[in-house]
Amino acid sequence: MKVIFLKDVPGQGKKNEIKEVSDGYARNYLLPNQLVKIATNNSVKTLKEHLKADQEEKELAKAQTKQIKKTLEELTLHFKLQTNDDKVFGSISSQDIVNQLKDLHRIELDKKKFIRFKNINKIGINYIKVKLDFGIEAIIKVDVKEV
């Protein structure tokens, strides 16, 4: 019997895979547990359309992520820290950076996406690496000045 897997079944098939299985196994285990559905011409056509739509969605999301990367790498965030005799008071946290991106540039970013981030407590230009979706990484430029 030809079936379409609705969920991953170890040793048998992965989700959305079309595969031939024995009739008894399909009727007695896979179908009652809603792990598969019978592969008819109509259901196969629907599955292919669904997979094509998913692929287009992924491509659109990847394009949007690349646009966000481009935007992040073009902008410079500006912060001010108080200093006294070459000592810096305070620091800039990942949450400060996320808030400025959200407030001034309307970019939503999770602070957990920062790679090996330590609070910034140096005056001057600092670079921060951020991991976006699809394995895309961006570098944010942060300019810290004295008050």
Swiss-Prot record:
<comment type="function">
    <text>Binds to the 23S rRNA.</text>
</comment>
<keyword id="KW-0687">Ribonucleoprotein</keyword>
<keyword id="KW-0689">Ribosomal protein</keyword>
<dbReference type="GO" id="GO:0006412">
    <property type="term" value="P:translation"/>
</dbReference>
<dbReference type="InterPro" id="IPR036791">
    <property type="entry name" value="Ribosomal_bL9_C_sf"/>
</dbReference>
<comment type="similarity">
    <text>Belongs to the bacterial ribosomal protein bL9 family.</text>
</comment>
<dbReference type="InterPro" id="IPR009027">
    <property type="entry name" value="Ribosomal_bL9/RNase_H1_N"/>
</dbReference>
<keyword id="KW-0699">rRNA-binding</keyword>
<keyword id="KW-0694">RNA-binding</keyword>
<dbReference type="InterPro" id="IPR020594">
    <property type="entry name" value="Ribosomal_bL9_bac/chp"/>
</dbReference>
<dbReference type="InterPro" id="IPR000244">
    <property type="entry name" value="Ribosomal_bL9"/>
</dbReference>
<dbReference type="GO" id="GO:0003735">
    <property type="term" value="F:structural constituent of ribosome"/>
</dbReference>
<dbReference type="Pfam" id="PF01281">
    <property type="entry name" value="Ribosomal_L9_N"/>
</dbReference>
<dbReference type="InterPro" id="IPR036935">
    <property type="entry name" value="Ribosomal_bL9_N_sf"/>
</dbReference>
<dbReference type="GO" id="GO:0005840">
    <property type="term" value="C:ribosome"/>
</dbReference>
<dbReference type="Pfam" id="PF03948">
    <property type="entry name" value="Ribosomal_L9_C"/>
</dbReference>
<protein>
    <recommendedName>
        <fullName>Large ribosomal subunit protein bL9</fullName>
    </recommendedName>
</protein>
<dbReference type="InterPro" id="IPR020069">
    <property type="entry name" value="Ribosomal_bL9_C"/>
</dbReference>
<dbReference type="GO" id="GO:1990904">
    <property type="term" value="C:ribonucleoprotein complex"/>
</dbReference>
<dbReference type="InterPro" id="IPR020070">
    <property type="entry name" value="Ribosomal_bL9_N"/>
</dbReference>
<dbReference type="GO" id="GO:0019843">
    <property type="term" value="F:rRNA binding"/>
</dbReference>
